[in-house]
Every structure is written in structure tokens, then in C-alpha cells.
UniProtKB/Swiss-Prot annotation:
Entry protein name: Zeta-carotene desaturase, chloroplastic/chromoplastic
Enzyme class, broadest EC rank: oxidoreductase
SUPFAM superfamilies tied to this protein: FAD/NAD(P)-binding domain
Keywords: Carotenoid biosynthesis, Chloroplast, Chromoplast, FAD, Flavoprotein, NAD, Oxidoreductase, Plastid, Transit peptide
Catalytic function, reaction form: 9,9'-di-cis-zeta-carotene + 2 a quinone = 7,7',9,9'-tetra-cis-lycopene + 2 a quinol
């Protein structure tokens, strides 16, 4: 099986480059052409003719019966002095912060070292016109901060609602489901989903039910804040350790929870904090729509980052692409306080010093480590950040000349007149990619191409074993694993492929790491942080990034008078220094 492609391994602070096209052929056999699905497929719906795409329904109300920290109330109108703000990083956290500050009347400039915005939710178009993503982006029904942002910028129609099921694809094309479609909502719809799932055997389902019944999830039904406190206190153990101590089985972890953990945090249940998984479970138990999934109509740059960018520009904000921060300039006052005096920026051979009243680092974990002055590690606050590490992830796109996930009708899977297959996020315990989707079905605006078939986007987690491999080898391995999951795709060819490698993506939400996450407000008076790794009640995710931006903005507005006073103080010091320089030159 021969393939050819090229790509570059990149860190999160620089553009990821993608792979060129490749063809991979499989020999057709009459056996697999006659392949028929089992009785499970009778439960699957045919793709909907009309797809719901608004945010006015099927969204969890996080204002009531939910931990207060997950969805802050609307901020009061800011009446303080207008501030000049410089944001490093045009990812979702940076743009969320910018939107909030612009709405409060501040002046905002965003600096991004890449040629495109969006960070981990960014995408770009290659020379052949293919949209290349940094990863697979799925929106839970409890992403209220992100939904609020999308409605604010006029992008509420850009998400497509999927069937309320979580589908597991097992080796040989056998499907399992957590089917949340039920006449009664939370918590009964979830109880029904777990009791009737065909992904686990009866014994494992029973032990699973016992473990969940003994969890803080039950308390969340009546006391969400108390349950969240309990969940935070479980951060120091892994989910596997907690789950099995409550009676759960190793089979349940391997066949159901590991794929979910990989999809959430890119690490398995033995390595992910119990806090991370139980945060999600508590929302699934208390909010009917929390487990309902949405995906973008098309590429993130067009349907997610694009509308936010347009809103920021319309409000007077400015983007400065390809401008990277080389150094944070700072001084100490006579009373020992540290404050930032500027940012040393560069773009190719150009250099400049950016001055502002407020400086915000909206970076990922490796980005903030590179940015912080080494002397600042004398503060425990900043030193703790170096105890966090990112998880490597590899995202692979495979374009086929047929419909890989169409399991009911082999002939239909070979025709290219109409899209066919499973239109949802898909999990698997039997491949190196724990979650994947056919974007030609799930996000058709940019990924469905007339005369072409499936575009599988597969997220390889953990990505460590794949990082050193050439793209040809990665594509070959993933193609074989796709065939093992979908034997009926025997004979379909890979007509194009791409590989994006990110050395450190989400921070590794392992046991005991939550205390090292920093607040958005730092010991440096005019320097703030934003990013999904920073302290917020949700996990490292798009929702967490958006929430961190709201929290950073709130801290800045609360300190508006103090920051304006610091501006005057710094201006006076600069004036005195310039007078001294002038006098020296006269002498």
C-alpha cells in the first residue's frame, strides 16, 4: 500500500502545515461487497433532510441548577476609564477576552504570530483549496459561554445539531450506542442511555450504574455547587482509580470510558483526573441537552473564528498577524511592585515595542512558558505553570472515493451522487484514533465536494508514538485501522490526505494538576492571563477558553481605576526619565 504526502510538525505558536494528496487502494473482494450490517443498524436514523442549526433550543440553561462558576452572570456596564489593551494570541481565549473588553468600551489590539487566527480551533486553506483543521471540534449542549459568544457575533446559525446519541464503532463494523433520546429528560434520559447501551455487557452495565450512583453526580441533582466542590476534591486521583474503587469494571473503562476520555482530554482513564470526567458526568446527569452534540457547518475559520474576527473589527479592535512577542519588558517600582512596560514584538525583520495599559497573554501552555520572563518564576504563581505540560496530538484527514461509514447498503456507499453514512461524532475503542467524524456529512459546507466521498477526520491520541513518523507511514496505519472498523469500505481508495502534528495541545489534565492552573489575575498588576488551561470550573476545551476570556475581562474591568492610575504613574516616570536623558545630552 503506497502513499505519499508531506507536512511539518509544529508547535501551537506557529502555523501547522498540512499534507499533500495521496492515493491508497484496497483490493475489492466479493465477501466484503456483500457485507451486511447486524441488527444494531435498525436503530440508526437516515440522515435528516432538514438540519436544525440555531441556538434558541436544545441548549442547557446553565443559569439555574448548575455550578455558579460555569456561566457567570452578564457583567455590569463598565463606567471607569477607557483602557488600551494588548492581547498576545488570537485563539478562542484571546478573542473571547477581546469581545468582552470591546463591549465595555476599551481599545483592543490582538497580536498573533501565525498567519491565521483561531489557535487550536483555527483552520487554513492549502494551495489545492482544502480546509485543514488543527483538530476535531465538537460542541456539547452545555457550552453556554461559547454559545453566548456565537449569538453575540451573529454566528448562532453556524452549528448543526446531531442526533442525541453517542455512537461507538467497534472492530468489524459493530456499533454500540449511548442513546439519550428519551421522552423524559435529565436524569432519566441518561439512566436509560446507560442501562440500555449495547456497548457494554449486562454485568459491566450494572457495575457502571453502581459506580455512578456512588458519585458526586447524584448530589449535583440537588446541590450543584456542593457537587462541584466534591468533584474538585477528587482531582488528585485518576478516573480509573476512582471508578474501580466504586465498583466499576476494567472492561467498562476499555470499551466505553477510555474513548470518551481520549476525546475530552487526549489521555486515557488511567491518566486523566477524576475531576475532569466527573465534571462532564455531572452536567450530563443534570442537564438534558448537555450530552447533545453539535458540529460546525464547515471550517472553523469560516464559521467560528471568522464571525468573531468580524465582530472584533467592527467594534474597533485590530488584529496584527505574524507579529510574535519576543520579550515582555518590565520594571520594579521603589516599593517592590513589578509592572509591564511594553512588549518587544517582531515580524520577520521588523521590530517594535508595543505599549498599553493592560497586557494579556492568551497563550497555550508551551506558549506561556516561552513568554514569561525567567525571573518571574520567583513567584509560586508563575512557577506552578511550569508544572503543566501539553499533550501531543496528530490530526489526520482522509478523503475517499466513496462513503466509508455507510454500513447498510454497499451500493450506496460506492455512488457519489449523494452523501451517505453516519452523521455524528464517532468514538472507537479499537483504533489509535479515539474519536473521528466524516466531515463531508457532519460539516458539509466546506467538506462535502460533489463527485467525491467521505472526508474522515481522525484524532490520534495519544499522539506520542506518531509524532516522529513520516506522514506516509501515519496515513498507511490510519487507513488500515479505518478498514478494520469498516470492513464494508474494502475497495474504496484514499484520494487525498493531510496530517497535522501539534507537539503540545491541551494541557495534560492528570491527577493533582488542577492546583497549578493559574488565575487570570496575576501578581503583576497590569499583566493578565487567558486560556483554557487557566483556572476555571470547566475542563480544557473551547468552552473553557471562552470562559477564561470572560473571567479575564471581569478582572480587568474591576481593576480599571487602579490600572488607569498606574498608566499615569508610568507616564510620569517615563517623562522624568526622558528629561534626564535630554539633560545628559545637553551636557
Amino acid at each position: 500500500m503506497a502513499t505519499s504526502s508531506t507536512s511539518s510538525t509544529t508547535s501551537l505558536c506557529f502555523p501547522a502545515t498540512s499534507a499533500a494528496g495521496a492515493r491508497t487502494s484496497f483490493r475489492t473482494t466479493d465477501t466484503f461487497l456483500r457485507y451486511r450490517r447486524s441488527r444494531q443498524l435498525t436503530r440508526l436514523k437516515v440522515r435528516k433532510a432538514v438540519v436544525r442549526s440555531d441556538l434558541d433550543r436544545d441548549v442547557s440553561d446553565m443559569r439555574t441548577n448548575a455550578p455558579k462558576g460555569l456561566f457567570p452572570p452578564e457583567p455590569e456596564h463598565y463606567r471607569g476609564p477607557k483602557l488600551k489593551v494588548a492581547i498576545i494570541g488570537a485563539g478562542l481565549a484571546g478573542m473571547s477576552t477581546a469581545v468582552e473588553l470591546l463591549d465595555q468600551g476599551h481599545e483592543v489590539d490582538i497580536y498573533e504570530s501565525r498567519t491565521f487566527i483561531g489557535g487550536k480551533v483555527g483552520s487554513f486553506v492549502d494551495k489545492q483549496g482544502n480546509h485543514i483543521e488543527m483538530g476535531l471540534h465538537v460542541f456539547f449542549g452545555c457550552y453556554n459561554n461559547l454559545f453566548r459568544l456565537l449569538k453575540k457575533v451573529g454566528a448562532e446559525k453556524n452549528l448543526l445539531v446531531k442526533d442525541h446519541t453517542h455512537t461507538f464503532v467497534n472492530r468489524g463494523g459493530e456499533l454500540g450506542e449511548l442513546d439519550f433520546r428519551f421522552p423524559v429528560g435529565a436524569p432519566l434520559h441518561g439512566i436509560n442511555a446507560f442501562l440500555t447501551t449495547n456497548q457494554l455487557k449486562t454485568y459491566d452495565k450494572a457495575r457502571n450504574a453502581v459506580a455512578l450512583a456512588l458519585s458526586p453526580v447524584v448530589r449535583a441533582l440537588v446541590d450543584p455547587d456542593g457537587a462541584m466542590t466534591q468533584i474538585r476534591n477528587l482531582d488528585n486521583i485518576s478516573f480509573s482509580e476512582w471508578f474501580m474503587s466504586k465498583g466499576g469494571t476494567r472492561t467498562s473503562i476499555q470499551r466505553m470510558w477510555d474513548p470518551v476520555a481520549y476525546a475530552l482530554g487526549f489521555i486515557d482513564c488511567d491518566n486523566i483526573s477524576a475531576r475532569c470526567m466527573l465534571t462532564i458526568f455531572s452536567l450530563f446527569a443534570t442537564k438534558t441537552e448537555a450530552s447533545l452534540l453539535r458540529m460546525l457547518k464547515g471550517s472553523p475559520d469560516v464559521y467560528l473564528s471568522g464571525p468573531i474576527r468580524d465582530y472584533i473589527i467592527e467594534k474597533g479592535g485590530r488584529f496584527h498577524l505574524r507579529w510574535g512577542c519576543r520579550e515582555i519588558l518590565y520594571e520594579k517600582s521603589a516599593n517592590g511592585e513589578t509592572y509591564v512596560t511594553g512588549l518587544a514584538m517582531s515580524k520577520a525583520t521588523q521590530k517594535q515595542i508595543v505599549k498599553a495599559d493592560v497586557y494579556i497573554a492568551a497563550c497555550d501552555v508551551p506558549g506561556i512558558k516561552r513568554l514569561l520572563p525567567s525571573n518571574w518564576r520567583e513567584w509560586e504563581f508563575f512557577d506552578n505553570i511550569y508544572k503543566l505540560v501539553g499533550v501531543p496530538v496528530v490530526t489526520v484527514q482522509l478523503r475517499y472515493n466513496g462513503w466509508v461509514t455507510e454500513l447498510q447498503d454497499v451500493e450506496r456507499s460506492r455512488q457519489l451522487r449523494q452523501a451517505a453514512g453516519l452523521d455524528n461524532l464517532l468514538y472507537t475503542p479499537d483504533a489509535d484514533f479515539s474519536c473521528f467524524a466524516d466531515l463531508a456529512l457532519a460539516s458539509p459546507e466546506d467538506y462535502y465536494i460533489e463527485g467525491q466521498g467521505s472526508l474522515l477526520q481522525c484524532v490520534l491520541t495519544p499522539g506520542d508514538p506518531y509524532m516522529p513518523l513520516p506522514n506516509e507511514e501515519i496515513i498507511s496505519r490510519v487507513s488500515k485501522q479505518v478498514l478494520a472498523l469498516f470492513p464494508s469500505s474494502q475497495g474504496l481508495e484514499v484520494t487525498w490526505s493531510s496530517v497535522v502534528k501539534i507537539g503540545q495541545s491541551l494541557y495534560r489534565e492528570g491527577p493533582g494538576k488542577d492546583p497549578f492552573r493559574p488565575d487570570q489575575k496575576t501578581p503583576v498588576k497590569n499583566f493578565f492571563l487567558a486560556g483554557s488551561y487557566t483556572k476555571q470550573d470547566y475542563i480544557d476545551s473551547m468552552e473553557g477558553a471562552t470562559l477564561s476570556g470572560r473571567q479575564a475581562s471581569a478582572f480587568i474591568c474591576d481593576a480599571g481605576e487602579e490600572l488607569a492610575a498606574l498608566r499615569k504613574q508610568l507616564a510620569a516616570i517615563q517623562s522624568i526619565d526622558s528629561i534626564g536623558v535630554d539633560e545628559m545630552s545637553l551636557v
